[in-house]
């Protein structure tokens, strides 16, 4: 699929491959500035992931796949006989960029499998493998959009958290893809988006994406979610996932667990939307998921950063929502309602 085909689906693209390297839309600058930066090394792509220039579990995996291509290109040019050894080092660097998003490790393993069979110049075959990962994610997004829209039906309002659209994926979106598909069916009146502190992905990215598609949206403070639910304005909370355990527990952006608890109290349903690659079948429950914690300086006012300050900050960027609080998990392989070890095992059978 060409970049033109990707743009036909989404008004924005987080990632674009060019002969010079990987073009990354710097999401830290949105919505004020739309700036693409070109990265031509695997280490550069790893830094782009770690610094959150690119973010969202599927997009992280796609970026890492292209990072392997860049690493292989440089390694083969330096030493055609031993390039694979150097690329393994690049894969290790990419794997350390973000610990929670399982799509990262899934994509790197796909690229490692493609690399194993290559003799000679690795770039054509590895670039084809990276493009397949990118294209497959877009196809999965479109499929999930239709499956999720069929569940939402004639929904008056939905609440979403963080950013799960084209900026976070190969195009179109996971949770935001469901919202897009529901809107295009004429079956949704309004989207509510949390600001999603501390990086404000909802305030900066989600409402910007919705505005690009002319979908009516209302931004609210994270702390206003309970009051919104009590008002009856929303019937569903629709979110993405960075990792789903084999029992249906879900790791997602910090605040998702709070929304799940609030939704259950107010009779609002919770839908999780993620590609099947986000399910980590080797992780039994959410208790086994490593939750990333970022620099406290992302939260603290400069006044409290001095060496003599007694003020600290705790900055986990994900939390884990128990399967018991989730009404539906939507993947391109099928939908699981009321997820449990048994229903997730059935999904695994479909995905094979």
From Swiss-Prot:
The active site is at 242 (proton donor). InterPro entries: IF-2B-related, IF-M1Pi, IF_2B-like_C, Initiation_fac_2B_a/b/d, M1Pi_N, NagB/RpiA_transferase-like. It catalyses: 5-(methylsulfanyl)-alpha-D-ribose 1-phosphate = 5-(methylsulfanyl)-D-ribulose 1-phosphate. Gene3D superfamilies: translation initiation factor eif-2b, domain 1, Translation initiation factor eif-2b, domain 2. Belongs to the eIF-2B alpha/beta/delta subunits family. MtnA subfamily. GO terms for biological process: L-methionine salvage from methylthioadenosine. It comes from the Bacteria. It holds the Pfam family IF-2B. The lineage of its organism: Bacteria, Pseudomonadati, Pseudomonadota, Gammaproteobacteria, Methylococcales. Pathway: Amino-acid biosynthesis; L-methionine biosynthesis via salvage pathway; L-methionine from S-methyl-5-thio-alpha-D-ribose 1-phosphate: step 1/6. Catalyzes the interconversion of methylthioribose-1-phosphate (MTR-1-P) into methylthioribulose-1-phosphate (MTRu-1-P). This is Methylthioribose-1-phosphate isomerase. GO terms for molecular function: S-methyl-5-thioribose-1-phosphate isomerase activity. Substrate binds at residues 55-57, 98, 201, 252-253. Disulfide bonds: none annotated. PANTHER family: METHYLTHIORIBOSE-1-PHOSPHATE ISOMERASE. The record marks 162 as: Transition state stabilizer. Its EC number is 5.3.1.23. The keyword Amino-acid biosynthesis applies. The gene is mtnA. It comes from Methylococcus capsulatus (strain ATCC 33009 / NCIMB 11132 / Bath). Keywords: Amino-acid biosynthesis, Isomerase, Methionine biosynthesis.
